[in-house]
Amino acid sequence: MTIQIDFIDETNEVTAEQIETLEQLIREAAAVENVPEGAEVSVSFVDNERIRVMNRDYRGKDAPTDVLSFALEEEGEGEIDIIGADVPPVLGDIIISIPKAKEQAAEYGHSFMRELGFLAVHGFLHLLGYDHETEEEERVMFAKQEEILTRFGLTR
């Protein structure tokens, strides 16, 4: 399963090796979820101020968060799907706060790489339509995250 993944590191704190691991992990998640060949996603690493502004502007929450996802394939109410069947989907953007990832890795007692992987998979699943607004949705989404991370070998 080949998908196009673009990484943008605004922090210069993520190593080439960590990016390679995340690329493999996202490809694994795409395979598990049967994402169409040629789909595209971008992953950006930012600081707390940048993600705080995005969280405020797009979610109305004026505080930094760990990960945001912006799905480009979501249909709004009353919209029709105009994407051709043969056009690879642009899934959207995943934005990860590096300071939050480091803080949470320390808080949960696991590696920075594990936390980055968790946040990347979490964001990726949001792009595919998973959510955690209800207890049932949360159970399904978090079980899927753990399945992918365990299958990849990125455990706590």
Curated annotation (Swiss-Prot):
Coiled coil: none
Family designation: Belongs to the endoribonuclease YbeY family.
Top-level class of the enzyme under EC nomenclature: hydrolase
Cofactor(s) listed in the protein's UniProt record: Zn(2+)
InterPro entries for this protein: MetalPrtase_cat_dom_sf_prd, YbeY, YbeY_CS
NCBIfam families membership: rRNA maturation RNase YbeY
Localization of this protein: Cytoplasm
Function: Single strand-specific metallo-endoribonuclease involved in late-stage 70S ribosome quality control and in maturation of the 3' terminus of the 16S rRNA.
Keywords: Cytoplasm, Endonuclease, Hydrolase, Metal-binding, Nuclease, Ribosome biogenesis, rRNA processing, Zinc
Species name: Geobacillus thermodenitrificans (strain NG80-2)
EC number(s) stated in the UniProt entry for this protein: 3.1.-.-
Range of residues in the leader sequence: none
Residues binding Zn(2+), per UniProt: 122, 126, 132
Name of the protein described by the UniProt record: Endoribonuclease YbeY
Cofactor note: Binds 1 zinc ion.
